[in-house]
Each structure stands twice: as structure tokens, then as C-alpha cells.
């Protein structure tokens, strides 16, 4: 929680509890701000129960996991209270995190949208050799008949071909970064989207 994060502590501990506030939406601002000074690998980020015990807010299970995956991911809930479907979803979420863990621990971070300043949060992690990347975004509040949200990735190799998942399309890095990707957020508040990029 508060005041546990200071630069000197990293001499003794590689990972710190980022905040006692584990609300999926609140964590976008908490993690965004913390990342200005500390590596994502040092930020302990947990998926917790809903309604959240600090804010009373309900956020989708998938969204809580997507935001937690932008740090050292864990779970803070009682597995005995989970349904069979939720347990299966956790297994899928853990597999997703394992696939991107190398980017969390050693990739380059690009902050695309600041949730404190706009109704949008987006961060992108890119491998040092630009061979792969992941982009995660959250739209906190749903907007009726709102404009399309276009995300502009950064840090890709302009001349390389990338497969974009889950769309299963192949585009040049330059095209992806300049034309952008339309973000199809799930209906409702606090929806997230995640895109993976792999050199084709």
C-alpha cells in the first residue's frame, strides 16, 4: 500500500505490493503513475474479488485480469467461492499471462493513453528485438453512439510484417502504427481489449 514503494527498497526486494486498492479500474491510474518511476516487473498486480472490497465497484473478470497482466500478476480471492466457469477462466488468464510474461519482465513500455486525463487507458509492451508486442486498453465508461476509438501502437519495426491477434491479419509495422486499430470494446463500462503482435 501507500509509502511501501521507494527506490531504495529495490536493492533488497525485486517486487513490491503496488497498492492496497486492487479495484480493476482504479489500478489503471495507479499502475500508470507507478510505471513512470518503477519497472513493471516490480509492481505486484492482483486480480481481486468483485464487488471490490475497497470501492464496491463491479468490473468484468476479464478486465481485472487484463490490467493485472501489466505487472507481476497474482490472484487475491478465495478459490472455494469460484464457479467452475470462473476457475476455467483463471486457467486461461494464467496461460495468457505466461505468454506475455517476458514482455512484462523485460520489454519496453509505451504509455499510449493516460486514464487520469481521458476516458481511455492504454499501454503497450514491446520486446527489445521488436519480435513481439502486446497492447492492452480499457474504456472506463461506455459512451452511447460515441466515436470509434482508434489505438495507435508504438515501438514496432516499421519494415517488418506482423500478425495481429485476435484479428489474424498481417500488416507492416508502419501501417499498424500510422493507420491504427479500431478498438471494439465489449458492451458496458470497464471493458478491455488486448492485441498481440508477432513478426510474421
Regions found by a protein language model. Give the residues of each.
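C-terminal beta-strand-rich structural cap/linker in extracellular carbohydrate-active enzymes
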Residues: 173-200
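A glycine-rich phosphate-binding loop feature that marks nucleotide/adenosyl-phosphate handling sites
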Residues: 1-9, 83-87, 110-118
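Conserved, mostly hydrophobic/aromatic
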Residues: 68, 135, 164
Amino acid at each position: 500500500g501507500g509509502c511501501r514503494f521507494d527506490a531504495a527498497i529495490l536493492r533488497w526486494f525485486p517486487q513490491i505490493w503496488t497498492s492496497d486498492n486492487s479495484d480493476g479500474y482504479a489500478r489503471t491510474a495507479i499502475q500508470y503513475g507507478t510505471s513512470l518511476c518503477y519497472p513493471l516487473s516490480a509492481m505486484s498486480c492482483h486480480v481481486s474479488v468483485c464487488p471490490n472490497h475497497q470501492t464496491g465497484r463491479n468490473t468484468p473478470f476479464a478486465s481485472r485480469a487484463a490490467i493485472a497482466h501489466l505487472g507481476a500478476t497474482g490472484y487475491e480471492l478465495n478459490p472455494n467461492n469460484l464457479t467452475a466457469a470462473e476457475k476455467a477462466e483463471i486457467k486461461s488468464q494464467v496461460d495468457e499471462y505466461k505468454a506475455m510474461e517476458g514482455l512484462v519482465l523485460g520489454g519496453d513500455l509505451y504509455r499510449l493513453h493516460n486514464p487520469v486525463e481521458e476516458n481511455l487507458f492504454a499501454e503497450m509492451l514491446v520486446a527489445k528485438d521488436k519480435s513481439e508486442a502486446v497492447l492492452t486498453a480499457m474504456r472506463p465508461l461506455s459512451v452511447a453512439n460515441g466515436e470509434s476509438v482508434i489505438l495507435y501502437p508504438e515501438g514496432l519495426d516499421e519494415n517488418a510484417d506482423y500478425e495481429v491477434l485476435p484479428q489474424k491479419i498481417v500488416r507492416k509495422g508502419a501501417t499498424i502504427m500510422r493507420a491504427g486499430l479500431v478498438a471494439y470494446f465489449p458492451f458496458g463500462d470497464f471493458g478491455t481489449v488486448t492485441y498481440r503482435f508477432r513478426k510474421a
